[in-house]
Amino acid sequence: MNSSELKGYLTGLMFGDGHIDKGVTKRAFAIKSIDKNFISKIKNDLESCTNFDISVKYVSPHFSCGCNHKEYWELRVKASPYFNKKYHHFYDDYKKRYASKEALSWITPNGIANWYMSDGYICHVGKTSGVIRDRRIEFCTDRYSMNTICLMRDMLLKRFNINTSLIKRGKFYRIRVSKSSYEDFINLIRPFIVDTMRYKLYLAYEQQPEWMSDDMWNYQKSLLSAITPSGKAGG
């Protein structure tokens, strides 16, 4: 990756579960995932184009704060001036998450894929009852303000031609990809999705919908082996 591609790549991680610490002249970056392959991909990608000091830690399943926690892997990049320069594009003056206009212009298809692997999910509505009535591709944006979420939606439309809608989950709002953009969205990110997260691209249609191209239908059939029991985000 060149420097622009690296910015776009990391921006996607930051829009998801990535975070930058509170250093002064240098800041560290970290991201966690229950998918080992996703963390390994990030490590390999960053090592191929940077001199970042990277470490990965495994945390076994455990009980704390009244909850059972799944095993996960955490990737950390040792404090670097690089992240100090990027910090204020992802945190406001009150240290709350947001996305600057510059950050929204940085993100790439690879970055969108990182964002989706980290904080995106597909829901097959009705699956537990045996009949899937609907499909929903969504980004969990609970940590962001309405203004930032709207800017993210605008970015997806203007830069990648991805139509979305805004949905409410409790007191938070999330981004839902419109059915008219399912195919464009999947084609945009599928080259970058790790095999163990390909289930997030599976729409679970038993018959080819009229709107779906033959190429996408064949791809969907190839994803069948990648389905997991959970429709939740694996990031």
Where are these regions (language model features)?
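Internal intein/HINT superfamily modules and their associated LAGLIDADG
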Residues: 1-235
